[in-house]
Amino acid sequence: MKKIRIDGNSMNLRDFILVARNGAPVELKDDARTKIKSSRDLVDCFVEEERVVYGITTGFGKFSDVVISCEETVALQRNLIISHACGVGEPLPEEAVRGIMLLRANALSKGLSGIRLSVVETLIEMLNKGVHPIIPEKGSLGASGDLAPLAHMVLVMIGEGEAYFKGARMSGQEAMKIAGIPTVTLVAKEGLALINGTQVMTSIGALAVYDAINLSKTADIAAALTIEALNGITDAMDPRVHQARGHIGQMDSASNILRLLKGSTMTTKQGEKRVQDPYSLRCTPQIHGATKDALVFIKEKVEIEMNAATDNPIIFPEEEDVISGGNFHGQPIALQMDFLGIAIAEIANISERRLERLVNPSLSNGLPAFLTCKGGVNSGFMIVQYSAASLVSENKVLAHPASVDSIPSSANQEDHVSMGTIAARKAMEIFKNSRKVVSMELLAACQAIDLRGKTLMGEGTEIAYQILREEIAQLNEDRIMYLDINKSEEVVKSNKLVDKIETVIGELE
């Protein structure tokens, strides 16, 4: 497997996923080692000189004006970790934890944090050997960074807390011992360097934006299947229409749908059956495309944050300087995560409306009510639409921005916070709900195609139809529907539809 070499400057979303989700090994680049050592040497000088520097020779937050003696610096750093580990709720999933560890190591490898090389190497060794700290999902204000959850990560490094190792939950001390990784004793600046950052919100956000990009392609596939099932009009996808407006995402979505439908005899032209389709079909490129454009923008900002120094204070070895700033503030990611949630929610909104057109006999251009031939005795897809509507409505609540909220903390020293991790967790929940809705549309569209009388389908939609039918048979009479929904979602989750279709018709945008 490809080894990911980090230096604090070159991390991208693809490499992040390889480590967080696929277990790729990580190592420091040589220049990163040099930079880490240089910044640590400067911190040691500050301690020896008893220079007053926030977080090195002072307390934290409201206690920043309390000077700490050289003899107390070790106790200061340990106390910081054990007192700040106040997370609550369920543990974050393994992939998010791995992402957090990777991003924190990457930020430290910039050499601006004043941490010892051996401590960074301990974090990387934990990642490579699969010692995954149990990090509760709740408790971060998003400024100063993700203090509480990151403290839970560091607990394991110092032999405290809990971790998962080889599938078992155990004490941090035991996990480190079994894995053969020595625990660390933190010295001046190191506790602060490890927990003062935005890596929790950024890790969750990176996973969400990566999956959302794939879902946006799957949504185009679902829309194309529904267009076939409803004998939709393809003229609205004409590239001239979308070039006239100029939005790249819109042009890409229309192009995707046309390529997916190429060769289909189930679609129509304007004037053959209708002059124009309803918005949920005709405006799909405009709606999906706006989400695609948002995802491009959000991905760019997330990748910047992946390579950011979000510590405080920041050490500048070349100038022999240290500056207290505010790079830990999560607002740049908080806004993007709220934007991400809204953008993904729109995918579900229009998908549910297309689903409604499939099941509603007044809107489906001749399909049987709720996609069952024996209505009354059978309910068919009636409650599938209910479930989709429920998820869409839940998304509307979740899409309320977290970043507009703030609550003062640390006796008003930290008087504006980002709530970025709440925004990221909400975006991930919206994504999961939206994936389910799109999965329901795919399921219903295949049923509608069967009931319409399947003829020659498009080059891409035929592949999608066959993959789904390999897993889920046509519904001839009522059966337990959640099982079919789950199977459809597993197909979407595996990205099998996108991967297979792209091998035949080329990459979807």
At which residue positions do the language-model features occur?
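Polyanion/phosphate-binding surface patch
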Residues: R51, V66, S253
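Cysteine-centered functional microenvironments
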Residues: I135-S140, E318-V322
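Short gly/ser-rich anion-binding loops that grip negatively charged ligand groups
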Residues: V66, C70, C86-E90, S109-S113, ...
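C-terminal auxiliary extensions adjacent to catalytic cores
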Residues: K2-A24, L28-K35, S39-V47, V156-E509
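Well-ordered mid-protein domain cores that form the structural environment of catalytic cofactors
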Residues: K110-N128, H132, A143-L147, A168-V187
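Glycine-rich, flexible loop motifs
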Residues: M1-R14, L18-V43, V47-E50, L80-P136, ...
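Conserved short loop/turn motifs at secondary-structure junctions
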Residues: A32-R33, G61-S64, L112, S140-L141, ...
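FAD-binding core of FAD-dependent oxidoreductases
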Residues: Y54-I68, E72-L76, H84-N106, P136-I158, ...
